[in-house]
């Protein structure tokens, strides 16, 4: 059977039944960590962010991480930025995370970084419900734009928090072979399906924002021996035994490596620019 046959089987299995349950916050956090361990994507994102943020020439750098999770990515980025500039600029990090346990881990990870040039805060709330009294050089949405009610509103809110010359960076999954599963099986979030890259691109470009699209980050994930929980995270739903079996067969069919379930795991990047730095007045 082809991957299309397995997708058709999944559609048939789910068509006559209630929508699959979503993931409980604790299970989401646990299985997210396990999923990331099977992919090289997070390290590639870390490298990309370090290069992007290090290119700023400002005397200090402030970052707002929307949907920061447990801080594994942001703490690694912060440590590398500080280490690469040992006598240099101050670094400010603010993480927004609705899940309290993950937010606490973000706070703990940042607190373990031994540098008096780092300051940080954590806000436990959805992005739409936050009220911040500071501005930032960079706002990041790393795999978090899926969950906002309205992409354009979130992007406009992010750009309103930018300093002159700043940018919002949205890193989002395309609707490729891997995420066809989530598109088919994941339950709605606050009345909408998860936003994939085509949705994000359309929302950003149609809302009048200044958007650049750098090259995607190409990665792979090896789900050959993935646990049931990791498969649930992969599709963003709690699978039934029957649907889980079909998911495993589908992954084997779309694998880049014969005899395994190694699947393309790319991430697209959107750079939304804030207001330009005002030019100097003529003399």
List PLM regions with ranges:
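A short SAM/SAH-binding and catalytic strip from SAM-dependent methyltransferases
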Residues: 137-152
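A short glycine-rich, Lys/Arg-flanked "PGG" loop and its adjoining helix->strand segment in the class I
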Residues: 152-167
């Amino acid at each position: 059977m082809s991957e299309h046959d397995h997708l058709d089987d999944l559609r048939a299995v789910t068509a006559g039944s209630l929508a699959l349950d979503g993931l409980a916050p604790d299970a989401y956090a646990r299985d997210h960590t396990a999923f990331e361990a099977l992919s090289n994507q997070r390290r590639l994102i870390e490298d990309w962010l370090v290069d992007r943020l290090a290119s700023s020439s400002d005397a200090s750098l402030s970052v707002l991480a929307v949907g920061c999770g447990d801080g594994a990515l942001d703490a690694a980025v912060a440590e590398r930025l500080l280490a690469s500039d040992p006598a240099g600029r101050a670094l400010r990090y603010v993480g927004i995370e609705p899940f309290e346990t993950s937010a606490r881990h973000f706070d703990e990870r940042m607190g373990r970084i031994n540098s008096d040039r780092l300051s940080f805060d954590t806000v436990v709330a959805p992005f739409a419900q936050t009220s911040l009294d500071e501005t930032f050089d960079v706002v990041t949405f790393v795999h978090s734009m899926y969950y906002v009610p309205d992409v354009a509103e979130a992007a406009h809110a992010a750009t309103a928090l930018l300093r002159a010359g700043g940018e919002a960076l949205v890193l989002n999954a395309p609707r490729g072979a891997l995420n066809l599963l989530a598109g088919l099986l994941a339950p709605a979030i606050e009345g909408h399906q998860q936003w994939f890259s085509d949705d994000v691109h359309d929302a950003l470009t149609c809302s009048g924002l200044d958007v650049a699209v750098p090259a995607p980050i190409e990665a792979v994930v090896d789900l050959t021996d993935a646990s049931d929980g990791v498969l649930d995270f992969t599709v963003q739903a709690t699978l039934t035994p029957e649907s889980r079996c079909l998911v495993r067969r589908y992954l084997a069919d779309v694998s880049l490596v014969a005899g395994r379930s190694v699947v393309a795991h790319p991430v697209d990047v959107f750079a939304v620019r804030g207001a330009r730095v005002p030019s100097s007045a003529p003399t």
